[in-house]
């Protein structure tokens, strides 16, 4: 099974991906996580360092695939999860989709692409071109990471459109949304009411999730000496269980941009004014999740 993880830049895709990979490994699966970002830091919390990228390795080998060995590009991370970083083209040049294609090509040459029970693609930021959507060409499922804010859901809607487009060529399905580090889910619920799709899990607003990224450790590793984090790990295990159940998923029908803007902004503003009329808080107390320009 192959799973592609998408979401707005900075939403916590890599942190979430690493913890899901560990959860899948805890369920007895052989897992490979492929980072698809020029920053090549997707697997940092699994390995504890920035591993060499496939593109860097191919350049050193002058693109002679026969000179590349699995140990040159595949690194064993925490919990037995294998890690690969695709890397990317130089800034302002080249195509991210080409890099993903070269990564898959090399893994096939090494007879590694089909050796895993689960391959998880952790993909950079928002989908802005066909190149960044390239991992969807190989995926059975897409998972979108979001929060309870306007911008993340706007990006999720764009990604849903890419899933629908790619589903025309192969049996790709959207497994669902994962809300990351949020204390509420009212906007998420409003969005999925208008654009039906599963919500796999909503992760709590726990500072240790963010801190784990800085420490270069997954929540599972931190929980070994901080048992109070075990309950957070259960959220990721629940996501893993849903993935392993091979859910039916959906082919989403995205909402037109202007309609989505009106839907979420009106809902947000109306709920704000309702709370104000009830004496809950005034304008200065409203926690803004987005800015209208």
Swiss-Prot record:
SUPFAM superfamilies: P-loop containing nucleoside triphosphate hydrolases (SSF52540)
Subcellular location field: Plastid, Chloroplast
Database matches in Gene3D superfamilies: P-loop containing nucleotide triphosphate hydrolases (3.40.50.300)
Enzyme Commission number(s) from the entry: 1.3.7.7
Keywords, sorted A to Z: 4Fe-4S, ATP-binding, Chlorophyll biosynthesis, Chloroplast, Iron, Iron-sulfur, Magnesium, Metal-binding, Nucleotide-binding, Oxidoreductase, Photosynthesis, Plastid
Listed InterPro entries: NifH/chlL_CS, NifH/frxC, P-loop_NTPase, Protochlorophyllide_ATP-bd
GO biological process: light-independent chlorophyll biosynthetic process; photosynthesis, dark reaction
Binding, Mg(2+): 14
GO cellular component annotations of the record: chloroplast
Binding site for [4Fe-4S] cluster: 95, 129
Pathway(s) served: Porphyrin-containing compound metabolism; chlorophyll biosynthesis (light-independent)
Cofactors named for this entry: [4Fe-4S] cluster
Entry's Gene Ontology molecular function annotations: 4 iron, 4 sulfur cluster binding; ATP binding; metal ion binding; oxidoreductase activity, acting on iron-sulfur proteins as donors; oxidoreductase activity, acting on the CH-CH group of donors, iron-sulfur protein as acceptor
Catalytic reaction equation(s): chlorophyllide a + oxidized 2[4Fe-4S]-[ferredoxin] + 2 ADP + 2 phosphate = protochlorophyllide a + reduced 2[4Fe-4S]-[ferredoxin] + 2 ATP + 2 H2O
Cofactor note: Binds 1 [4Fe-4S] cluster per dimer.
Binding positions for ATP per the UniProt entry: 10-15, 39, 180-181
Coiled coil: none
Family of the protein in this entry: Belongs to the NifH/BchL/ChlL family.
Subunit text: Homodimer. Protochlorophyllide reductase is composed of three subunits; ChlL, ChlN and ChlB.
Function of the molecule: Component of the dark-operative protochlorophyllide reductase (DPOR) that uses Mg-ATP and reduced ferredoxin to reduce ring D of protochlorophyllide (Pchlide) to form chlorophyllide a (Chlide). This reaction is light-independent. The L component serves as a unique electron donor to the NB-component of the complex, and binds Mg-ATP.
Name of the molecule in the record: Light-independent protochlorophyllide reductase iron-sulfur ATP-binding protein
The organism of origin for this protein: Adiantum capillus-veneris
Taxonomic classification: Eukaryota, Viridiplantae, Streptophyta, Embryophyta, Tracheophyta
